[in-house]
Amino acid sequence: MYVDYGYYIIRPCRCPEFLKDFSEWILTVSGCICDAEPQPFSCMTGDERQKEKYRKRLGMEKQEFIDFSEETLRLFGEDRLDTDSRFLFKQDAEDIYRRYFYNRRGVDPGYRLIGIALEEALLPSLEDRLIQKKEVSRTEERRFLGFDLLIWDISGFHTYLCNSLQEELMKRFELKPGRFGLLENSKEEMEAFAEAIQNRGEPVEWMPFAVYDDTPAAAEGSEIHGKI
């Protein structure tokens, strides 16, 4: 049984050169490759130049950015937003997405709201590393994008792609990356992939996560919002 573990607002990025055209686009919760929003530390920094740089990257007007930062820090202070921009509750993620990232003038329309889920049996592996929900929700029927192999390290997730472990896997298995580089292999194949790279790249446990598209327009059955 897969259970939801959190929600992210992320913009897919072009495949980095070091991945050697693994996929045209990459969508992952790993901050080494993609940026997730909002970023609590960028909102709370006392460095005004850094904060202004962040505002401009988001394409927000000054007052809008002030409101955005205040809301971000409120959620962070209430343990509803984690250090890596992970929303613990879907409603919070949807509210921020609709207010600041959906069809907003000047804001990049390519942002996606995604959910990640993992086997319930694996939850204990993360209990001492992440803020946990008081209740674990089961995944609902929604658009499945594919699987990612992730580990939690210090303050955020890393994907197996960070260490180019896809090269090792491709020597032994057939990987089936989809549009965003997420794997369309079976659950059983993903478990085999995770086992094959244990203790490789990072000295922690690799786990297969299911990734879902929770972007509001997609959830309503229409086209995924935004063009990349």
Locations of regions flagged by a protein language model:
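Acidic, proline/glycine-rich low-complexity IDRs
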Residues: 189-228
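Conserved aromatic
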Residues: 83-91, 181-188
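Short aromatic-glycine-(Arg/Gly/Cys) micro-motifs in beta-strand/loop hairpins
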Residues: 2-83, 101-111, 115-120, 130-180, ...
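Short amphipathic alpha-helices within nucleic acid-binding modules
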Residues: 93-98, 186-195
